């Protein structure tokens, strides 16, 4: 079986993904955090060529296209990319994007020039060989270029499940008895990811926690009713320890050396 067949494809459930992820407070907060990080990134201060690996429905890619960047979106799911293209037309940026239904493992075959900036968000945790994927990202970015990598944090998943009282699940080392279609099956230990990045030829220039507080609220209704204050707190503290390390996701800015 090929790697492309093994890795997760969201064809057939793109609409469910949009409703349950992108349109929720989780998705809104993630978008705001990433856009804040990018607004402070000198690599994106002027229009650039960007590759978005596992772009999904393109929420972040299209926001960058609106800032003047040329963005190539790739994803295993054609359904996701079709939604991205439709949204791009509505925003008037369809001439600034290209969409390709390709797995990460196929991108080296395209003979594209290396990109100054590569994004790979919430992808590694769906792959069977995440360490190999980081090496493949290094091959796609220019030396001296930037990779924005966001991954699902196993430490944070463990912490949240302890808080919820899911002790048996934690004692099974977060092994699912029944798989949940939109829940990543392979959360990653941050120390492993840091090591893989170094071995692949990257230096970590920045680290941000994503959803450092959102998932831990005692009153979950406040995720919606107090969203503005929650976001303000997130943006103020999500680069400081220990909070950065308990974000449900970690966002790393990697410099290719």
Language-model-detected regions and their locations in the chain:
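Class I SAM-dependent methyltransferase SAM/SAH-binding core
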Residues: 59-106
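A short glycine-rich, Lys/Arg-flanked "PGG" loop and its adjoining helix->strand segment in the class I
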Residues: 131-146
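Acceptor-substrate binding/catalytic loop of class I
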Residues: 176-192
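A C-terminal cap/extension of S-adenosyl-L-methionine-dependent methyltransferases
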Residues: 206-257
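A conserved beta-strand element that flanks and buttresses the S-adenosyl-L-methionine
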Residues: 119
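Conserved class I S-adenosyl-L-methionine
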Residues: 1-45, 47-54, 59, 63, 91, 146-173
């Amino acid at each position: 079986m090929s790697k492309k067949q093994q890795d997760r494809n969201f064809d057939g459930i793109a609409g469910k993904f949009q409703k349950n992820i992108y349109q929720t407070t989780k998705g809104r907060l993630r978008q705001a955090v990433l856009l804040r990080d990018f607004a402070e990134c000198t690599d994106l201060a002027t229009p650039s060529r960007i590759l978005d690996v596992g772009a999904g429905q393109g929420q972040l890619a299209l926001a960058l296209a609106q800032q003047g960047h040329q963005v190539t979106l790739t994803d295993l799911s054609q359904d996701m990319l079709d939604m991205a293209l439709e949204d791009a037309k509505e925003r008037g940026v369809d001439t600034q994007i290209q969409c390709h239904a390709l797995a990460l493992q196929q991108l080296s075959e395209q003979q594209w020039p290396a990109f100054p900036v590569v994004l790979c968000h919430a992808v590694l945790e769906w792959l069977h060989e995440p360490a190999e994927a980081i090496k493949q990202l290094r091959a796609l970015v220019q030396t001296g270029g930037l990779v924005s990598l966001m991954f699902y944090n196993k430490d944070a998943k463990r912490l949240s499940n302890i808080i919820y009282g899911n002790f048996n699940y934690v004692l099974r080392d977060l092994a699912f008895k029944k798989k949940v279609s939109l829940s990543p099956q392979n959360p990653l230990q941050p120390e492993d990811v840091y090591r893989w990045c170094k071995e692949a030829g990257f230096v970590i220039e920045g680290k941000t926690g994503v959803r450092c507080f959102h998932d831990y609220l005692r009153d979950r209704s406040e995720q919606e009713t107090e969203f503005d204050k929650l976001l303000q707190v997130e943006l103020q503290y999500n680069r400081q320890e220990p909070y950065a390390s308990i974000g449900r996701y970690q966002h790393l800015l990697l410099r290719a050396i």
